């Protein structure tokens, strides 16, 4: 058992937040002596418009192109430059370094992300909404970042643009474009711990003499083992995009990407954490709970197109469409060892008996078709200029899951072992049956949305809007439909040219499969987010800071009555709608260029989430996190960049009624990097992660998984 952390954490957190607030004010003094910020040098990476660690404008949250300080919600930008500095490979890496986001690793191929106490299931690709689910893993959390320029995260309820989801956050992945009219590109080779080798090629050029049609191709291949024995992963990525200026005011972009991951020795869940006497099983970081024949392979193919036209009066029309096909093929092993209700372990530390071998062979497939079009622009009313936007959205997701699940043991057809002690993964594979249909269905969302940004006075802006969603689910014997209106309201007051304060109210809904006593499905869970905060911006929005206080409420959450559904199937329990989880907390973030050549991001978050019985929820996730990363390029030695960071989280625990609870102390992960440009064409970069080699769990829920120990990599890049 891991002992809890000392009670000094609130004091440490307060000191850290005060220090961060002081840091946020520092640029005011800096601005008095610094050169005109518009003269600061910029780095251009392969034709892309670099913004350091921040962006000057974004359409995140509202579709309006606004500076971060003009948006009445908490947002985080993970830029291309930061992705490069930290050597972030995939969505797991990005969200693990994002303010206010925490995660739990279900197994080697599934990682679930949470914000403000709620599961994140709302994702967007260039603004087109979709939902990702983890019960049948399609590899979404492992999406490769090589084809994305940046990631934008809006925290809280985001129903205006997302449709159905949880009041946690929305993650928007922005693709790279063909924005170079000349031949330009790079080749990079990354080698590192556990036999890691990753090669990436990125080439772009004009496709006609005038440069109005441009193309870009990105390819990447990763081959790596892991700190866990008998695990290997291969990832292949191909991406191509064509951008065309059809007229000076009309742009067309068409892209296609292919991603394939092959994971051998994949786990399903984690390893057993407790023996039957309640003592720790004591496995180390290299332990793999799976046999040698397990694997988890995923393949995704995604076509995407956008058309945008700007009118002379300042209005804009944009439409985007995507078709996505994803398949997964996996053979997995699950070492069942405990009672699901009490957590009591059957695993005998002396004999190794008590592990019930379970195995699954699954083929799953998902198809997504989505289209979203909107207009936005200015209009005059009462002598003032305002903004308006309206759009239509359609999203259809078809899925089918096929599988064969087998339980082994003494006296059964598959009896691979009698003792789990001295486990080496060398056991027999079940004789699989033909795969049968486990589940299939179609989820469709049709929506219309609109919002206006009213200039009530020079310093005061009001954003109000709503989304009407027609949601329908067919299949799995549970056809359902809901028609939901989701409001949005935000008020922003400019204190001066640097600071603004805001208040917002946003909603989102989540359908549920529970029935009342008459057999009718309950209305969707309603997530309501209240938020107030202060934001600041310096150096033409190259540095942004925000502090927010929030409250999130869930209504219409199903609560069991203990009574049967009238006319229902045997054992079907009736539910009533009740108040659900309430989450309260605050967040702080400072992100961008503190001084010429010095970029940094610092985020602090704290929340407390309780259910209707006033009990903490998701106690295996940290309620308090601090995340820092910085990079510095000396003005006198601009070929050298150095940096590093630290992520800290507080104590977590998981209740095991039979023994008490499993606890993990708070811990800090430290990272560092250095990059040197040998010549205008060649550079080398070294990254070190978990510098102090901290041993920690990335999952504790009766089953365990370890986070990565100390590891490093070298990246050699040739640019042309």
Regions found by a protein language model. Give the residues of each.
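C-terminal beta-signal and adjacent terminal beta-strands/loops
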Residues: 647-655, 672-720
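Short acidic/polar hinge/loop motifs at secondary-structure boundaries
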Residues: 103, 112, 128-155, 174-175
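Outer-membrane beta-barrel translocator/receptor signature
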Residues: 131-132, 147-149, 160-238, 246-250, ...
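N-terminal Sec signal peptide and the immediately downstream disordered periplasmic leader
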Residues: 1-86, 92-100
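Structural signature of Gram-negative outer-membrane beta-barrels, strongest in the C-terminal barrel
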Residues: 245, 366, 385-397, 437-554, ...
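Membrane-embedded beta-barrel scaffold of Gram-negative outer-membrane proteins
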Residues: 308-312, 316-322, 326-332, 526-593, ...
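Acidic/polar loop-and-plug regions of large Gram-negative outer-membrane beta-barrel proteins
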Residues: 222-226, 239-245, 249-310, 325-366, ...
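Gram-negative outer-membrane beta-barrel transporters
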Residues: 457-459, 576-657, 692-695, 715-717
């Amino acid at each position: 058992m891991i002992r809890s952390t000392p009670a000094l954490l609130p004091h440490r957190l307060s000191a850290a937040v005060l220090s961060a607030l002081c840091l946020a004010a520092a640029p005011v003094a800096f601005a008095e002596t610094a050169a005109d910020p518009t003269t600061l040098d910029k780095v251009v990476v392969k034709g892309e418009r670099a913004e350091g660690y921040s962006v000057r404008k974004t359409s995140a949250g509202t579709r309006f192109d606004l500076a971060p300080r003009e948006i009445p919600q908490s947002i985080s930008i993970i830029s291309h430059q930061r992705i490069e500095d930290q050597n972030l490979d995939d969505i797991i890496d990005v969200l693990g370094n994002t303010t206010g986001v925490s995660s739990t690793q279900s197994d080697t191929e599934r990682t679930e992300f949470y914000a403000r106490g709620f599961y994140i299931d709302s994702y967007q690709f260039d603004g087109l909404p979709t939902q990702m689910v983890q019960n049948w893993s399609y590899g979404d959390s492992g999406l490769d970042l090589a084809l994305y320029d940046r990631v934008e995260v809006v925290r809280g309820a985001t129903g205006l643009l997302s449709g159905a989801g949880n009041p946690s956050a929305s993650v928007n992945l922005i693709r790279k474009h063909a924005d170079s009219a000349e031949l330009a590109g790079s080749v990079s080779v990354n080698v590192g711990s556990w036999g890691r080798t990753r090669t990436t090629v990125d080439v772009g050029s004009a496709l006609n003499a005038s440069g109005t049609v441009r193309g870009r191709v990105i390819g990447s291949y990763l081959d790596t083992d892991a700190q866990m024995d008998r695990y290997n992963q291969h990832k292949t990525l191909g991406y191509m995009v064509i951008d065309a200026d059809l007229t000076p005011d009309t742009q067309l972009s068409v892209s296609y990407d292919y991603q394939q991951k092959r994971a051998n020795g994949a786990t399903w869940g984690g390893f057993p954490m407790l023996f039957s006497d309640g003592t720790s099983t004591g496995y180390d970081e290299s332990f793999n709970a799976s046999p040698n024949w397990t694997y988890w392979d995923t393949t995704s193919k995604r076509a995407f197109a956008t058309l945008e036209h700007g009118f002379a009066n300042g209005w804009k029309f944009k439409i985007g469409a995507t078709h996505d096909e994803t398949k997964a093929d996996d053979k997995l092993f699950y070492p069942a060892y405990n009672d699901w209700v009490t957590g009591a372990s059957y695993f005998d530390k002396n004999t190794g008996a008590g592990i019930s071998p379970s195995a699954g062979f699954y083929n799953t497939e998902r198809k997504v078709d989505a289209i979203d079009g909107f207009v936005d622009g200015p209009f005059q009313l009462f002598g003032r200029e305002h903004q308006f936007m309206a759009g239509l959205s359609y999203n259809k997701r078809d899925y089918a899951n096929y599988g064969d699940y087998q339980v082994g043991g003494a006296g059964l057809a598959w009896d691979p072992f009698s003792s789990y002690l001295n486990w080496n993964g060398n056991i027999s594979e079940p004789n699989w049956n033909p795969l049968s249909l486990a589940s299939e269905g179609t989820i469709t969302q049709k929506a219309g949305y609109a919002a206006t940004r009213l200039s009530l006075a020079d310093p005061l802006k009001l954003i109000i809007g709503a989304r009407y969603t027609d949601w329908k689910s067919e299949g799995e014997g549970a056809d359902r439909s809901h028609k939901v209106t989701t409001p949005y309201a935000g008020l922003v007051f400019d204190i001066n040219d640097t600071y603004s304060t805001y208040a917002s109210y946003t909603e989102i809904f989540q359908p549920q499969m529970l029935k009342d006593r008459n057999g009718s499905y309950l209305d969707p869970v309603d997530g309501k987010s209240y938020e107030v905060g202060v934001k600041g911006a310096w150096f033409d929005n190259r540095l942004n800071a925000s502090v927010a206080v929030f409250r999130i409420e869930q209504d219409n959450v199903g609560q069991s009555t203990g009574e049967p559904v009238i006319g229902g199937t045997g054992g079907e329990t009736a539910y009533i709608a009740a108040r659900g989880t309430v989450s309260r907390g605050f967040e702080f973030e400072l992100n961008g260029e503190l001084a010429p050549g010095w970029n940094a991001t610092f985020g602090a978050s704290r929340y407390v989430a309780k259910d209707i019985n006033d009990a903490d929820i998701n106690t295996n996730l940290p309620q308090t996190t601090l995340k820092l990363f910085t990079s510095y390029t000396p003005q006198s030695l601009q070929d050298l960049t150095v940096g590093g960071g630290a992520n800290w989280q507080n104590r977590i625990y998981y209740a095991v009624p039979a023994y008490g609870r499993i606890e993990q102390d708070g811990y800090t992960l430290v990272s560092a990097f250095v990059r040197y440009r040998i010549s205008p064409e060649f550079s080398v970069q070294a990254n070190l992660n978990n510098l102090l080699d901290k041993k920690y769990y990335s999952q504790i829920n009766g089953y365990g998984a370890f986070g990565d120990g100390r590891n490093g990599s070298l990246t050699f890049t040739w640019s042309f």
